[in-house]
């Protein structure tokens, strides 16, 4: 606070602007003017000093006590100066009623201010409560309707998942049956191919046998033709010999009787038929043994093939079941991952909401703490003001008790020097501002020549309030108030 000229204030109690580091500047002052008693006294009087003005012995007006103002200034040093002027005042009035009335008025003003601050505090608390009640439903919306729809959708999803699993199981069963039928078909095809291969082998053997039979028949036919040729040749030779010899020679040949060729052939047939039968039986036996071996091999191979096919079918079934289980596990994993992502998103949203709620509550708590600290500081300041007022009351009471009636006025000039008080906890400096006390001309019936002419000086009180934060001036407020000083004129 910068002061220019006379730094007294005649305005009533008005708090200055609230700022972050400057608390309220409270001013408690009395009304302008003094009580009637022959002198008109201004309220600009230095605190703690009694100013007297010289009078003639014949002119002794009744002195009146003038109320002094109290200024509460926070974080400012008050400096008071007047252009090298000596102030003259009057003596102390010992009227106890007027003094007590003044003190009662000041105490009533103080109590009125305390009640006003309490009302403001209650209004602020009610506003804070209303704001918190208003913000609660916004921060905590009702999701019950959404929960019901979510539950219905989850039930539908579960039903569709069950239906899908049932259809998948049916598809798997049909695939398994199709695989079984395909395996049976392949087995039948393989058996058919084996039978066809066996029939082809038998056909080849039959062809070989038919070829052998044809060869034998050709040999028999050739032998028959040779036999006929031999017979014909023999007949021709006999005929030729008979023709050469004629009928002259009778040659008797005692030869063995000619064998019957049919009989010989029959005998040969009888000899060869058992051999052929034995050979045929051997061949048939060999063929049957080969066929039995082949059949046994076919049966064993078919059994092995069936076993292998059964194993393959079982392995395919196990593979299909494992694939179905794997797909089910994959679907379950995907569903669990989707549920996990949904839950993470939901809980992250909830966490963000809760974090925002916590931040809002922390901000509100910080504001409430700041308000409480500010109110605590104001309360401490008011308590300090109360203690100062009590001290002043005690000093006034002691002064009233020490004064025994009216005292004579002793002329004395006093320099305006402020007497500062000690600072309170919040850094506010409480000082009694200087008040310039002067008297109007003597109001007695007989004018006193010793009073002399009086002059009125107009002094402007300029009060500048600055709000400083981080070494920078944020806002500034200037209040100018005029003040009249009455002093004897120079002759």
UniProtKB/Swiss-Prot annotation:
Residues spanning the signal sequence: none
GO terms (BP aspect): epithelial cell differentiation; intermediate filament organization
InterPro entries referenced in this protein's UniProt entry, alphabetically: IF_conserved, IF_rod_dom, Keratin_I
Location of the region described as Coil 1A in the Swiss-Prot/TrEMBL record: 97-131
Region of interest (Linker 1), ranges: 132-142
Residue ranges, annotated region (Coil 1B): 143-243
Chain ranges of the IF rod domain: 96-407
Matching Pfam families: Filament (PF00038)
Region (Head): 1-96
Residues of the site described as Stutter: 345
Region (Coil 2): 260-403
Keyword annotations of the record: Coiled coil, Intermediate filament, Keratin
GO molecular function, one term: structural molecule activity
GO CC field: cytoskeleton; cytosol; intermediate filament
Expressed in which tissues: Expressed in skin and scalp. In the hair follicle, it is present in the upper hair cuticle and the upper cortex. Also present in the in the upper portion of beard hairs (at protein level).
Span list, region Tail: 404-491
Linker 12 as annotated region, ranges: 244-259
Source species, domain of life: Eukaryota
Role of this protein: May play a role in late hair differentiation.
Subunit relationships: Heterotetramer of two type I and two type II keratins.
Record's miscellaneous remark: There are two types of cytoskeletal and microfibrillar keratin, I (acidic) and II (neutral to basic) (40-55 and 56-70 kDa, respectively).
Family assignment from sequence similarity: Belongs to the intermediate filament family.
Name of the featured protein: Keratin, type I cytoskeletal 39
Organism the protein comes from: Homo sapiens (Human)
Native organism taxonomy: Eukaryota, Metazoa, Chordata, Craniata, Vertebrata
């Amino acid at each position: 606070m910068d002061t220019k000229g006379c730094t007294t204030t005649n305005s009533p109690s008005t708090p200055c602007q609230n700022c972050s580091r400057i608390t309220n500047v409270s001013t408690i002052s009395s009304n302008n003017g003094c009580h009637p008693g022959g002198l008109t006294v201004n309220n600009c009087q230095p605190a703690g000093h009694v100013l007297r003005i010289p009078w003639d012995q014949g002119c002794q007006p009744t002195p009146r006590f003038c109320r002094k103002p109290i200024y509460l200034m926070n974080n400012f040093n008050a400096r008071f100066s007047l252009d090298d002027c000596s102030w003259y005042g009057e003596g102390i009035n010992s009227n106890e009623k007027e003094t007590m009335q003044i003190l009662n008025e000041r105490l009533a003003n103080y109590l009125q201010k305390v009640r006003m601050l309490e009302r403001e505090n209650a209004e602020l608390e009610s506003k804070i409560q209303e704001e918190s009640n208003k913000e609660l439903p916004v921060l905590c919306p009702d999701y019950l309707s959404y929960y019901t729809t979510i539950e219905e959708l989850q039930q539908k999803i579960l039903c569709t998942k069950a239906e899908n699993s049932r259809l998948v199981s049916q598809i798997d069963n049909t695939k398994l049956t199709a695989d079984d039928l395909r395996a049976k078909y392949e087995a039948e095809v393989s058996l058919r191919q084996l039978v066809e291969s066996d029939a082809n082998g038998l056909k080849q053997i039959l062809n070989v046998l038919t070829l052998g039979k044809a060869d034998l028949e050709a040999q028999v036919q050739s032998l028959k033709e040779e036999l006929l040729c031999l017979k014909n040749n023999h007949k021709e030779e006999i005929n030729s010999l008979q023709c050469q010899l004629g009928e002259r020679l009778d040659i008797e040949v005692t030869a063995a009787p000619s064998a019957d060729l049919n009989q010989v052939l029959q005998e040969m047939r009888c000899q060869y038929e058992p051999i052929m039968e034995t050979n045929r039986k051997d061949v048939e036996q060999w063929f049957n043994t080969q066929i039995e071996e082949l059949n046994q091999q076919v049966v064993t191979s078919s059994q092995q093939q069936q076993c292998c096919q059964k194993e393959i079918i079982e392995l395919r079934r196990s593979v299909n079941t494992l694939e179905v289980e794997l797909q089910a596990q994959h679907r379950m994993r995907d569903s669990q991952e989707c549920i996990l992502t949904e839950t993470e998103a939901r809980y992250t949203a909830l966490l963000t909401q809760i974090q925002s709620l916590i931040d809002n509550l922390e901000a509100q708590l910080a504001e409430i703490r700041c308000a409480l600290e500010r109110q605590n500081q104001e309360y401490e300041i008011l308590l300090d003001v109360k203690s100062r007022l009590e001290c002043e009351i005690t000093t006034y009471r002691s002064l009233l008790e020490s004064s025994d009636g009216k005292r004579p006025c002793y002329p004395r000039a006093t320099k305006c020097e402020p007497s500062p008080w000690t600072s309170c906890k919040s850094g506010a400096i409480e000082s009694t501002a200087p008040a310039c006390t002067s008297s109007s001309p003597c109001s007695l019936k007989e004018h006193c020549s010793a009073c002399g002419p009086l002059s009125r000086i107009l002094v402007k009180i300029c009060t500048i309030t600055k709000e400083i934060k981080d070494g920078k001036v944020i806002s500034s407020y200037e209040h100018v108030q005029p003040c009249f000083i009455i002093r004897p004129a120079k002759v």
